[in-house]
Amino acid sequence: MPAQEQELFGLPQVLINFRTIGTTAIKRSAMGIVAMILHNEEKDEIKNYTIRDVSDIPETGLTADNVDLIKKCLLGTPLRILVYTLPMSTVDGATHTQANVLRMLANIKWNWLCAPTATTQEQQDLASWIKTQRPTKRKTFKAVLAEQDADHEGIVNFCTNDIKVQTDTDVLGNPVYTIYTAVQYTARIAGILAGLALDRSATYFKLTEVESVEVYEDIDTLIDKGEMLLIDEQDGDGVKIARACNSLTTFTTDKGEEFRKIKIIESMDMIRDDIRDTFKKYYVGKVINDYNHKMLFVSAVLVYFSEIKGNVLDADADNTVDINEQYQSNYAKLHGDDPTTMSAMEIRQYNTGDTVALAGSIRLVDAMENLTIDFTL
């Protein structure tokens, strides 16, 4: 009995934590972490750096081009950048590869991945890795890659080239420009997406440092193909992100058209991480897995849902979570019991060992992006 009382006494912490993470959701959503992979080393080795601002960039050890890419990422104000440096392509017989870095990244916390010095093959390998990590490992990793037709909600396919940016002035005070490729500017885009709060979309986000970009004949068709592009509409507003879309173009009943919106995927990932992290911190190994404790956890999740209504969840929708009765029924059948002879409550209360199976329905809110007006005069 004392142990049971102690467990029950500790449960209010879960409610407090869910309420806290709910009220801080927008602020926390603007503090994403970027993982950046760079070819930099002249020896067969991997180094890593944690960069929170420009003062963290080492004075030696990184090439000038790589320092520039890190600074471009910092413009988006991510919480921090986890920089991993690989051998340059000129290092003969190098054994340290991108695969080694991915093994390091697999079990740490970050949000957006970019590799602005990667080869086409390395970009393809990153796309394959993200596609594996999200469904099978239940990770919320995402990547900004260049010209990768990945058809996946976790991968942004950035395709704008000829990105003209003033990077210096000459002795006469005239501007000196650098032309960036799409793969190089994935660093900038990853920084933007990591530092952007969920109270807005990245659509029409201004890149004030960019002077001009390539021009498209039919940008709508390209966006429909899952390409994220920069555009200058020559309206005096400068260069901006045309549409905050990921590379998903194949839609199903499980993944509808809303899954192509970066804001929607970011919201889903934040909810998954918040619930999973709280479960690990307050429940795993600490709470008896009976019906009452399951329902206490359900109540805590509902409190969290109530706190993120508005900018994350649709305030007018019925956002719910409950015991997964289908899982409970299947579990009972697998363990030799006949669920057809059981009442609904008996199925809900069936002992599922160390597993908590919940089912829910939520409606995520998007930012305004399209305007349709029909005037009748």
Write out the residue ranges for each language-model feature.
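Structured, hydrophobic secondary-structure cores that serve as assembly/anchoring elements
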Residues: 1-69, 74-78, 200, 227, ...
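Short, surface-exposed beta-edge/turn micro-motifs
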Residues: 31-33, 109-111, 140-141, 225-228
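Extracellular Cys-Trp
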Residues: 66-204
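Long, low-complexity, intrinsically disordered N-terminal extensions of eukaryotic proteins, enriched
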Residues: 170, 210-213, 238
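Acidic, serine/threonine- and glycine-rich low-complexity intrinsically disordered segments
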Residues: 205-222
